[in-house]
Structure formats: structure tokens, C-alpha cells
Amino acid sequence: MQTHEIRKRFLDHFVKAGHTEVPSASVILDDPNLLFVNAGMVQFVPYFLGQRTPPWNRATSIQKCIRTPDIDEVGITTRHNTFFQMAGNFSFGDYFKRGAIELAWTLLTNPVEEGGYGFDPERLWATVYLDDDEAIGLWQEVAGLPAERIQRRGMADNYWSMGIPGPCGPSSEIYYDRGPEYGVEGGPEANEDRYIEIWNLVFMQNERGEGTSKEDFEILGPLPRKNIDTGMGIERVACLLQGVDNVYETDLLRPVIDKVAAVAPRGYGAGNHDDDVRYRIIADHTRTAAIIIADGVSPGNEGRGYVLRRLLRRIIRAAKLLGVEQPVMGDLIATVRDAMGPSYPELVTDFERINRIAVAEETAFNRTLASGSKLFEDAARATKKSGATVLSGSDAFTLHDTYGFPIDLTLEMAAEAGLSVDQEGFRTLMAEQRQRAKADAAARKQAHTDLSAYRELVDAGPTEFTGFDELTSEATILGIFVDGKRVPVVSHDGLEADRVELILDRTPFYAEAGGQIADEGTISGTGASGTARAAVTDVQKIARTLWAHRVNVESGEFVEGDTVTAAVDPKWRRGATQGHSGTHMVHAALREVLGPNAVQAGSLNRPGYLRFDFNWQGPLSDDQRTQIEEVTNQAVEADYEVHTFVTELEKAKAMGAMAMFGERYPDQVRVVEIGGPFSLELCGGTHVHNSAQIGPVTILGESSVGSGVRRVEAYVGLDSFRHLAKERALMAGLASSLKVPSEEVPARVANLVERLKAAEKELDRMRLANARAAAVNAVAGAETVGKVRLVAQRMSGGMSANDLRSLVGDIRGKLGSEPAVVALIAEGENDAVPFVVAVNPAAQDLGLRANDLVKQFAAPVNGRGGGKADLAQGSGKGAAGIDAALAALRAEIGRS
């Protein structure tokens, strides 16, 4: 049975049973705790928690899922995949354990001709949570399973959660016995290679808190209602129904393996275990990478981008180790498109962009391998020379940080060289780097990942946002928090702004979201203790429902239950709306100029400024930048009306509304329309009323922020005027200094630059001529140190390393065939101290090496150097040590 048929039968079965088919969500959701969607139930979490009312009591979906913690196990075992399709059925307060077991058993065991999968009931097993006697009874009653094919297991195996705070509950798993050829008897408890899990039925009834493992977390209490969340692995079922040993042999992954085998010198399944692992890595990772890129991620060095980059680079490395020298990424991505496109049409419609990003990463990493391999070879050689057998963590970190080498590549190359790697040292340096990168952001933002302190307020209901209609609102303080702990009162006592939060029942303040930073303003009130005032410095959402106002209490005290006035700074809001609407305008202009593949990858807008990231390979031309700026400002000048309305998500998409990749949208969405067809986006931010209110948009520049991602920055409104005024003043100053009209400044500057280049070239020629004359005198004055003729001189200032190399060659040629060493050092430009050492063949026969001597030469000038036996060079920063360097060199030669 082909995979597409397995998918169809699953959905048909549950639709007939009264379930609504729900499309797969993106693998990226706006949840800071979740790198990728890793379960079918993730998009339904608000329904399980009771935060939102589900539009249906029963639902079914086949969700794209990604799990990467076991990435190093992929290919080694045949059970691990980074991407999988999770087929699920969900009940929101409707049926519970009996219904879940009945529906699953019917689909699995019904004959194929009746729409089922036709599994032999005698080969199916079930596991349940330790004390779930009810589930055991139902398996015996509904399915007729004998007690010996039902096993009890603990928290680690049969109590399910996402691994983070959220819904959880005991589970019951269904296993298929593949037969004695796959291992010993004894059920799943004894052997999970023989007994393979195909379906997990989760009885979602509790909410969990923070924890450190599958077994160590707090149960916060019951959910508002009992729910069902099940997950059937499409790939595993396909493996069984297609009669193959593992998922890599199925109709979705085998085509990728065959594509690689067509160009690799060694085939798949030829008896080489390591090669088979590499084939599986390529098949698994290519599919995952294509899905991630399709959902809007580009390779990067953090978070999801880092995972994608690692996947792509593991593909490339595995292909290289199979002996494939030609580029393969384009063919692999096309194979995934052909195999999975019928189920995931975005792989077809967005193929050009997906392919472009993957191929660009392949090209970049091939360069990385070429340059980094030299550094690895040097480090390995130095390690062996020192008598050690362990490559340092520092070297491994440099390979990773500077050249992008994944640690597993370094490990493999080290093993081939007969070395191991200090992995602990590497991990320490990596941890320090990540800590440094995140320290500032962590200090500024409190992530609200632990909701236990806010639970009562979250359960009481959401904050009412009034900011679309007014900038000032009367409100009641629902809660006061200091350092995340609830307190009844807070007063002006020097508490830092980020430590105090006020939760209101209603607010006009926009909470940071969608790239728009939070409003600023004040909260004030008059209570029993007098007048109180607080400056609002930030506003963040808690559980997407509560607005937490981070404040600096400037006077008086605030008491829970007080009535207060929340007032947004109108100047701030005006600037924020200009920035946000300007972002939409620039986005529309980008797509008009570059085409539909210029997809948003992120944004930031604040009063007077916007930053827009988009997926694009290579820098924009000057003409493209000018066009984008012109299209944007033409739309501003057109004074388009900005219209907002709320509609159903599917209707908005049908209208062509742009949605941000990875964002999770509710069923009812807000649409922002600027100028009819010019710009139409899903957006919950604040905006101007017409485009002319944005004011001029001035693009400051365009740059790269990662592989395949570009960034445009711009000023809007008054800040744009100020920027233009500065540029005008700068041009006027240049014109005055050059004594030409403004319009002649570019030509005048170009002329001056050419004259300067000519003068510098002539100066270099004269300096080198003088140096060559000095070289003749240097040969005549060569000293004898032991058996070696030595020319060691301090040259006149301004000499470059290239100049010194040229002179060294002249001098060495004039010293003849007897043992000779030439060492020149100079005071170069920008406080640099370049130096070069040359050793002729006769001196090398005496044991002298330029790459050894240059180290003695470098130390006194605080420099570094390296090279080969005949020629080495370097540079330092301490001109005061030049004489000492010359003396050290003489002494070293004298000891030889």
C-alpha cells in the first residue's frame, strides 16, 4: 500500500466518524519554547488548555513533524527520522478512552477492502500507564487483546507531554510484532526492534509544569475537560504495509537513496555498514531540509536556521564520504519534490526558492570544506608533533566557529588521522559563546516560560485590548508582580523597570508582537495612598492572553484592584504606526520589484525606523534598491486608504493575504489592506489611516544577515526628513571644501581618488627603488654568524610585507650559494611591524628553517608568523621591539 493511500484511508476513516479534517500546520510556530512542531497536537494546545473554544468537538489531521535531538542516531538505527508525518485524531471533551481505542483498532484491523489497513490482530500488542486499569479493561473488551499482550510501563514510556509546560496525560501505545527474525519474544518491554510502535493514544487530562526529564515534572492539575490526542506514524505504518525492513526502503525515501546511488561509486546495501548509514542520512535529511525551507527557514547560526544548516551540511558531507564529487543538492531536492509534492504542494509551488537556498548552502559548504581542511591538517600535524593524541577543544571550536565545521565532521576527520577530540573542551567553548550571545537579550526580556505564577489570571480571562480605538483607557489592576512573584502592592522604592509588572483588565498599550515593539506611555491613578504614576517601558504577552506592562514606578504606590488610567504616548504610537505601515509598503515593493520569491523572513519596526528581512540569494543591485524605494514612495504619495477588517483565515488566504511563515493564526484573523491590491497582509499591529501619513521612506542600506536572507533598513516620517537633511548638509560641506557645485562633487571626488592612487603608486615605486639601493649595501655589509652569512636589517618606515618579500628575494640571490639567512623588518603603516625571513638551501642543510626562525623574530614585537622552511613572514604591533627582534634572531642562529 503506497503512502498516499495510507494517508487517504486514515483521513477518510475519521471523517466518516464525525471528525473535521484540519490541514497540517507549519512546522514553525511562534512559541519560544518549541523549536519545531514535534507532535500532531501542537496546533490544538489552546483548545486542550481551555484558552480557546474549539470550532469542532472532533478533528483529524496529518501533521508535519520534526524532531532533531537524536540527529546523530539517524541512519545508524532504522527507527530514527528527523521528519515524520503524524496522523492523529482529536477529541475535545467528546469521546475519551473507549472511543479512542475503538476507532484505532477498527482502522488497523479492518480488511483492506473495507477501508482498513488489514493488520493481523494476533500480531498487535498494547502498553498502558502503570495504574491505568481502565485502559487494560477496554483493550480486553473492545479489541479482545489477551492480558499477556498488554504491558504496563512507567512515566518515561507511557505518560506523554511535549517536553515543556502544557497539556499531558497517560497514554496507551499500539505495537506490531514483526516476528522472531527481528529479535526475542517478550513484547515491547523486551525488544522495540521486533515490536515496533505504530500508534500512541494519549488520554489528555492534565497540565504539567517545568521539569528536567520525561519523569521529572510537576502535574499542575486537571485540564478543563478530558481530551483525546493520538498519533500514528505514517512512515512506520508504510514500512509494515509495504513489507520492507525499514522506513528508508519505503516509497518516500527510497527514491532519494536511488538518486545518490546513481552517481556514487559505492552502492546502497552492498555490505558496507558505514556507507549505508550515509545513504540514510542523505535520504532523511534531504526530506527534512526541504520541508523546513518550504516553511520559511533559511540556513543560519542560531535556532532553526542552525538546525537547517547542520542538516544540509551533513547531507553534503555524507555524499563526499560516499565518493560523490559533483554537486547533488539540486537533484536531491527535486526527488523529494516528486515523492512528496502530492501531499505537500508547497514543495512544488515553491520549488525554485527551496532549491536555490539548498544549492547555495551546498556551494558555500564546499568552499568551507576546502579552506577548513587545511586548518584541520595543520592542527592535526601540530598535535602529533607534540606527542599528543587528542585534538584540542580550542582547535575544534575554531573549525566550527570560523569555518562552519560541524563537530561530527571534526570527529570523523580526527579519527581518520588517528586522533580523538577534546569534546568536553569544545562543548565548554560552545556554551560560553552561546551564553555571551544570549546574555544581553536574556537580561532585557523575561520570557514568561513558567506560567505558574500567572495561572490564576490566565484562567480568569484575557486582557481586553482597546488600542485600535483609543490611546487612553480606564482599567483595573488585576495583578502586580515583582521579579515574577505576585504582590498586593508596589511603591516607588527604586525598583528597576524590568522588575515590576502590572496586569490590567483592559489596555490601549500594544504588546510586542509581529515585529512591532511595544508602546510606551504611563499608567497613573489616585488611590487611598494618593497619586501614583508609572512609566511603561515594555509590554509583553503572557500565554498570548494577558498583557504584562513592565513599568518604572515614579511616584506613589499601586494596589491590586486600583482603578488606573493607562495612556499611550501619542507621539510614540504615531511613529510606531508609521514604521509598521512602512514595513508593509516595503514588503509590497520588494515583491513587485523582485517577484513572489522575496518572502518575508522577519521584521522589526519602531517609531521612525523599520527593518525587513526577506529570503533572497545575493545582494540587490543599486538599480533594484532604487526601484524598491521609488515604488514604496509612489505608494505613499498615492495616499492609499489603510483598511483593516476581521475575517476567517481561509477566506483571507483565498483573497491573497500574505501570512508570515511560521506564525500561528487563529480561525478569525485581522487583515490589513493598503491600496486594495497593493498590500494585503494578515497583521495584528497598529497602522496609519492612509499611506501619506507614513511620510517619505528612505532606504538606508541592504545587507546579508545569513545564508539566503537579506535585510533592508529604512527611515520613515520625520526621521526620514532628518536623515535626508544630514545627507544634504554633508553634500554641501563636501562641495564647499572642494570648491565645486554640489552636482559636480562625484566627478571631483573621482578625479581626486585617481590622482591619489597615481601618487601612491609613484611613492611606492620610489620607496622600493630606495630600498633596493639599500639592499646592495646590505649584501656588502653582511655579517658572519657561525657558518652563516646573515643580513638582518631594519628597513625604513612605510614598507609592506610585499615590499619586504621582494627585497628578501633580491638580497638572497646576491649572497651566492654559501649558507645564508636574510631577515628584514620594518615599521609599516597603521602601526604594523611586518617582517620576513628567508633561508637558502645551504643554510637549510645546517638545520636552519625560516618557519622556526620567524617565531624568534616575532616574539619581541608582539607578533605572529609562519611559513615554510625557505620563506616565512609575519607581523607585529610593537615597533619598540624591533632591535630586540634582530638581536634574538642573531642569537638563535649563533646557537645553531
Curated annotation (Swiss-Prot):
SMART domains: tRNA_SAD (SM00863). Its cofactor is Zn(2+). GO terms for biological process: alanyl-tRNA aminoacylation. It catalyses: tRNA(Ala) + L-alanine + ATP = L-alanyl-tRNA(Ala) + AMP + diphosphate. Keywords: Aminoacyl-tRNA synthetase, ATP-binding, Cytoplasm, Ligase, Metal-binding, Nucleotide-binding, Protein biosynthesis, RNA-binding, tRNA-binding, Zinc. Binds 1 zinc ion per subunit. Pfam families: DHHA1 (PF02272), tRNA-synt_2c (PF01411), tRNA_SAD (PF07973). It is found in: Cytoplasm. Coiled coil: none annotated. GO terms for molecular function: alanine-tRNA ligase activity; aminoacyl-tRNA deacylase activity; ATP binding; tRNA binding; zinc ion binding. Gene3D superfamilies: 2.40.30.130, 3.10.310.40, 3.30.54.20, 6.10.250.550, Bira Bifunctional Protein, Domain 2, Threonyl-trna Synthetase, Chain A, domain 2. Its EC number is 6.1.1.7. Belongs to the class-II aminoacyl-tRNA synthetase family. Consists of three domains; the N-terminal catalytic domain, the editing domain and the C-terminal C-Ala domain. The editing domain removes incorrectly charged amino acids, while the C-Ala domain, along with tRNA(Ala), serves as a bridge to cooperatively bring together the editing and aminoacylation centers thus stimulating deacylation of misacylated tRNAs. Catalyzes the attachment of alanine to tRNA(Ala) in a two-step reaction: alanine is first activated by ATP to form Ala-AMP and then transferred to the acceptor end of tRNA(Ala). Also edits incorrectly charged Ser-tRNA(Ala) and Gly-tRNA(Ala) via its editing domain. This is Alanine--tRNA ligase. The gene is alaS.
